[in-house]
């Protein structure tokens, strides 16, 4: 077995574990609060959302926590591990007026602990954003259709970059030569108007 011989088919994997600079805490968010404290967070979101606008008829809030450990064991370098806490809090509100119903949604979280959600009016701000979106949707009219120029801001439009560029940069696609970016390191692959920065160390 691997554990018995510290090798796999003759490949030595016993090279120790190298520590690098931590980008986030390694504590487990799952046990950072008890069940009643977690429920209280959802109760606060519910109360805040309903207090912001009398048209809010339903509030749905969710809280999830994970604590993931990843170990990378190359054959030619020291092993490295990543311990990442992940917290996700979301709230969705249903607003109704004159027979019309609209929904607003907002979420927060990241590689943080649960107590971060209670700082700086975070819960109230989250509820306020969900209610704001629902309110905007209540007054919304059908958007114009057809071909037009658009400007994408920061945030969710990043999903478009992920799909259009991110998957094409994956190692397997480039190894097999099936990516549009294969063999183009150092070459321009987009228009002059397009600049994409991928840096996992940028805060938030």
Residue ranges of each PLM-predicted region?
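Active-site bordering "gate/hinge" segments
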Residues: 1-203
């Amino acid at each position: 077995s691997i554990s018995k011989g510290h090798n796999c088919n003759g490949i030595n994997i016993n090279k120790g574990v190298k520590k690098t600079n931590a980008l986030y805490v390694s504590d487990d968010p799952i046990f950072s609060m008890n069940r009643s404290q977690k429920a209280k967070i959802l109760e606060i979101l519910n109360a805040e959302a309903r207090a912001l606008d009398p048209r809010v008829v339903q509030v749905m809030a969710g809280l999830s926590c994970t604590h993931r450990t990843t170990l990378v064991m190359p054959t030619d370098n020291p092993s490295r591990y990543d311990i990442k806490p992940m917290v996700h809090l979301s709230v969705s509100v249903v607003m109704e007026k004159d027979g019309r119903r609209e929904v607003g949604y907002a979420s927060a979280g990241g590689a943080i602990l649960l107590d971060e959600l209670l700082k700086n009016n975070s819960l109230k701000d989250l509820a306020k954003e969900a209610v704001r979106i629902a309110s905007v949707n209540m007054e919304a009219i059908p958007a114009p259709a057809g071909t037009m120029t658009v400007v994408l801001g920061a945030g969710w439009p990043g999903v478009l970059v992920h799909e259009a560029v991110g998957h094409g940069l994956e190692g397997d696609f480039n190894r097999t030569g099936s990516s549009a970016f294969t063999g183009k390191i150092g070459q321009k692959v987009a228009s002059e108007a397009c600049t994409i920065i991928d840096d996992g160390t940028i805060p938030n």
